[in-house]
């Protein structure tokens, strides 16, 4: 299947819509986002995808949006993604919660990160049940999030 990828965040959301339109125009039937960490951002991505489908090729089948989610269970991971991976935005509330948990120990840090990630997964699934769960070969975390 012709799938494409797109950033999950941009300072100017219209650039994301233009990129989606270009991918749809070239035949993408599905667009997978970089990991999403904010429900409001997810809602915006759905709106941008809808607009891109309408403006690009209304005669074609619509390209479906698939949210990427990468569970974060460590403060260092959240900081790295936020600072060094373009197109991904980890909310400050997540970073702060993980910072506090990290000070309490590794187990607490994992627990807080897992709970944030699980809640996000459940919220995204309720909003739009097309999700790509990325776990970097951590199959247990995938199983735990899906259960």
What are these regions (language model features)?
Residues 1-4, 45-69, 144-147:
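Alpha-helix-loop-beta-strand connector modules within alpha/beta enzyme cores
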Residues 1-14, 124-125:
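Glycine/proline-rich, positively charged
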Residues 5-10, 62-120, 137:
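Active-site pocket-lining/capping segments in soluble small-molecule metabolic enzymes
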Residues 12-24, 113-123:
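Short, acidic/polar
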Residues 13-15, 35-53, 138-145:
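Active-site-adjacent beta->alpha loops and helix N-cap segments on the catalytic face
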Residues 23, 27, 67, 131:
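Conserved, mostly hydrophobic/aromatic
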Residues 29-39, 111-112, 132-135:
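Catalytic beta/alpha-barrel core
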């Amino acid at each position: 299947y012709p799938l494409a990828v797109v950033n999950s965040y941009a300072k100017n959301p219209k650039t994301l819509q233009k990129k989606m339109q270009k991918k749809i125009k070239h035949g993408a039937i599905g667009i997978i986002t970089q990991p999403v960490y904010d429900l409001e951002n997810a809602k915006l991505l759905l709106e941008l995808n809808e607009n891109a489908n309408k403006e690009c090729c209304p005669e074609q089948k619509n390209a479906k949006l698939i949210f990427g989610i990468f569970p974060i269970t460590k403060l260092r991971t959240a900081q790295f993604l936020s600072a060094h991976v373009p197109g991904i935005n980890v909310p400050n509330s997540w970073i702060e919660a993980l910072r506090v948990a990290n000070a309490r120990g590794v187990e607490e840090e994992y627990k807080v990160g897992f709970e944030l990630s699980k809640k996000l997964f459940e919220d995204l699934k309720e909003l739009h049940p097309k999700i790509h769960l990325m776990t970097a070969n951590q199959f247990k975390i995938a199983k735990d999030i899906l259960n």
